[in-house]
Amino acid sequence: MSDRQTQIPAGGGREDDHDDQVQSAGQVQVNTEGVDDLLDEIDGLLENNAEEFVRSYVQKGGE
């Protein structure tokens, strides 16, 4: 997975605040490293025990 960045524009009303707005316009960064590690772990488990995983999933009422 790739890291995603979302820019959130800062609002304002005065033109002389333009430089401050540009500097204070925030970016939200989502760290997906933990999610990638978890998905890698799940992939590893499925490679070794896919049949058992499916059986237990169906027994628990999964669709």
From Swiss-Prot:
Keyword tags: Isopeptide bond, Ubl conjugation pathway
One GO BP: modification-dependent protein catabolic process
Pathway(s) of this molecule: Protein degradation; proteasomal Pup-dependent pathway
Quaternary structure (record): Strongly interacts with the proteasome-associated ATPase ARC through a hydrophobic interface; the interacting region of Pup lies in its C-terminal half. There is one Pup binding site per ARC hexamer ring.
UniProt region (Disordered), positions on chain: 1-28
InterPro entries noted in UniProt: Ubiquitin-like_Pup
Protein's organism: Corynebacterium efficiens (strain DSM 44549 / YS-314 / AJ 12310 / JCM 11189 / NBRC 100395)
Name listed for the protein in its UniProt record: Prokaryotic ubiquitin-like protein Pup
Pfam family, one: Pup
Top-level taxon: Bacteria
Described purpose of this protein according to its UniProt entry: Protein modifier that is covalently attached to lysine residues of substrate proteins, thereby targeting them for proteasomal degradation. The tagging system is termed pupylation.
MF annotations from Gene Ontology: proteasome binding; protein tag activity
Keyword Transferase: no
Residues forming coiled coils: none
NCBIfam families reported for this sequence: pupylate_cterm
Family: Belongs to the prokaryotic ubiquitin-like protein family.
Chain positions covered by the region annotation ARC ATPase binding: 19-57
Chain residue numbers at which the record places covalent cross-link Isoglutamyl lysine isopeptide (Glu-Lys) (interchain with K-? in acceptor proteins): E63
Annotated transmembrane regions: none
Notes concerning its domains: The N-terminal unstructured half of Pup provides a signal required to initiate unfolding and degradation by the proteasome but is not needed for pupylation, while the C-terminal helical half of Pup interacts with ARC to target proteins to the proteasome.
